[in-house]
């Protein structure tokens, strides 16, 4: 077997990825299909963490715009991410993959609290760790959660597994047929160009901690494994990448 490019990764999934064609809620067959892809990678000895958004169940910003207190709206979203994490953990366990959910808010009846040292021990024992409930504070996105946790666990890369999006373009390819896809970008170029891969806080965290971002289409079977083993899939963002004009 080829040597993997990344030995410890954090996979960032949107909540909508769990909703399937419905677009909202949780579609269990879809979750099970994603879990199977992740399990195949775990079987290769790769250490895996997951962060899953909650947009399939709740979105804090629109709720706040409709009049709800923003802090309460964001805490509600954190509960949504935990629901997604528990469903994904169960799907992985059904495949025989030892998995732990760690939450930034104490929910000891259903998950472990987030403790960095414990997470690292789980990786050493071959377990997948799913980080839920954001960073435990309002106003921070799950993108920022992914970047922060990736830095804390010394992840080699953040895999931005997108639902039907195959990389980063200089314009919206759905609106502009001449849009150009980048194979490689630097973190600095992403920030300068205002490319909306992840939010600004997460982008800066990734740059400062020298963490690669790989944006790719998760709907293509086997893509997660291809990225980890170094195939040129999607767009790679790093501090060392050469910008494709």
UniProtKB/Swiss-Prot annotation:
ATP binds at residues 12-15, 55, 59, 163, 169, 172. Its EC number is 2.7.4.22. GO terms for cellular component: cytoplasm. InterPro entries: AceGlu_kinase-like_sf, Asp/Glu/Uridylate_kinase, Uridylate_kinase, Uridylate_kinase_bac. It catalyses: UMP + ATP = UDP + ADP. It is an enzyme of class 2 (transferase). GO terms for molecular function: ATP binding; UMP kinase activity. Pathway: Pyrimidine metabolism; CTP biosynthesis via de novo pathway; UDP from UMP (UMPK route): step 1/1. UMP binds at residues 54, 74, 135-142. Residues 20-25 are annotated as: Involved in allosteric activation by GTP. It is found in: Cytoplasm. Keywords: Allosteric enzyme, ATP-binding, Cytoplasm, Kinase, Nucleotide-binding, Pyrimidine biosynthesis, Transferase. CDD domains: AAK_UMPK-PyrH-Ec. The keyword NAD does not apply. GO terms for biological process: 'de novo' CTP biosynthetic process; UDP biosynthetic process. It comes from the Bacteria. Allosterically activated by GTP. Inhibited by UTP. Homohexamer. NCBIfam families: pyrH_bact. Belongs to the UMP kinase family. Catalyzes the reversible phosphorylation of UMP to UDP. This is Uridylate kinase. It comes from Streptococcus thermophilus (strain ATCC BAA-250 / LMG 18311). The lineage of its organism: Bacteria, Bacillati, Bacillota, Bacilli, Lactobacillales. The gene is pyrH.
């Amino acid at each position: 077997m080829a040597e993997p490019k990344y030995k410890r990764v954090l996979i960032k999934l949107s909540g909508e990825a769990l909703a399937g064609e419905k677009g909202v809620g949780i579609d269990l067959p879809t979750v099970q299909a994603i879990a199977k892809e992740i399990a195949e990678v775990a079987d290769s000895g790769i250490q895996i963490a997951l962060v899953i958004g909650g947009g399939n169940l709740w979105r804090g910003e629109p709720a706040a715009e409709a009049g709800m207190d923003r802090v309460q709206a964001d805490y509600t979203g954190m509960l949504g991410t935990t629901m997604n994490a528990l469903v994904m953990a169960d799907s992985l366990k059904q495949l025989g993959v030892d998995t732990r959910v760690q939450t930034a808010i104490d929910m000891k009846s259903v998950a472990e609290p987030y403790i960095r040292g414990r997470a690292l021990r789980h990786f050493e024992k071959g377990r997948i760790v799913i980080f839920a409930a954001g960073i435990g504070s309002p106003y921070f996105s799950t993108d920022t959660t992914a970047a922060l946790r990736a830095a804390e666990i010394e992840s080699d890369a953040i895999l931005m597994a997108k639902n039907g999006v195959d990389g980063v373009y200089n314009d919206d390819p759905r609106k502009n047929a001449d849009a150009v896809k980048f194979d490689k970008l630097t973190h600095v170029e992403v920030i300068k160009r205002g490319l909306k891969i992840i939010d600004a806080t997460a982008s800066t965290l990734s740059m400062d901690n020298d963490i690669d971002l790989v944006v790719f289409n998760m709907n293509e079977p086997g893509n997660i494994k291809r990225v980890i083993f170094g195939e040129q899939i999607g767009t790679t963002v790093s501090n060392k990448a050469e910008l494709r004009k």
